[in-house]
Amino acid sequence: MKLFIHGVPDTPHLWEPLISVLDLSENDYRAPALPGFGCARPAGFSATKEAYTDWLVGQMEDIGGGIDIVGHDWGALLTLRAVSLRPDLVRTWCVTNAVIDPEYRGHTMARRWATPILGELVMLGMRNKKRLLPAMIAGGMPKSLAKKEVPLIDKTMRQSILDLYRSADGLRFSDDWVNGLANLPQRGQLFWGETDPYVDLSVAKRFSERWNVPLHVETGAGHWACAERATEFATLLQSHWA
């Protein structure tokens, strides 16, 4: 079973180009929405990094094993954490344009979202969809994807983003989240958009070297390389899964 985990501020729409190229049937994969991202946020759900990890582990346990998991952005971070906790459920894993790295201090927007009051002010600006759409495209989100994602960035998602980033102190990871990576299964893969303005390629290279994980760099692609270069990503995944 293929399991695709999106990031922030995305929804499962992220995976549509890739799933189309892979020609997967509905019985071949799952691409759930993170709670609060284009869907309701369950009562009592705290939207912290630990809460989302528990949610993802639950998704994996529901499948039961033999999982080929793929994660992007926060979905990549949650994938790494969940897989390190339950490697027994995973056949292969692949993450794109985000990794758990103790030296990475977070991009500018992550630090703003993590800051009380400032984060709320940023989110007020994100309510203006006419301005947000071109801003997302300028940040590297493919236009066709942005037209689907931006309308779904509602109050629930905005609050979930704030809660998530604050639980991670922006994007600063340490202790078990880092040390647990030693438990990752061997069949891992990195797929990276070369020009990502949020997470520099050097972060991917450092992770690749430290944990001995193959790194594919997609020249000229940005943070959403998994959608922008869906054909190339599909080719890599098919080889990775073989």
Give, region by region, the residue ranges found by the protein language model.
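Conserved HGGG/HGGXW glycine-rich cap/lid loop of the alpha/beta-hydrolase fold
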Residues: 1-41
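The conserved beta1-alpha1 loop
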Residues: 5-7, 72, 192
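Active-site loop/oxyanion-hole signature of alpha/beta-hydrolase fold enzymes
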Residues: 30-70, 235
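Gly/Ala-rich beta-loop-alpha elbow adjacent to hydrolase catalytic centers
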Residues: 71, 75, 79
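Flexible "cap/lid" loop of the alpha/beta hydrolase fold
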Residues: 84, 92-122
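Conserved alpha/beta-hydrolase catalytic His-Asp/Glu region
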Residues: 104, 126-183
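Conserved serine/cysteine hydrolase catalytic core
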Residues: 159-208, 217
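Catalytic histidine-centered segment of alpha/beta-hydrolase-like enzymes
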Residues: 221-234
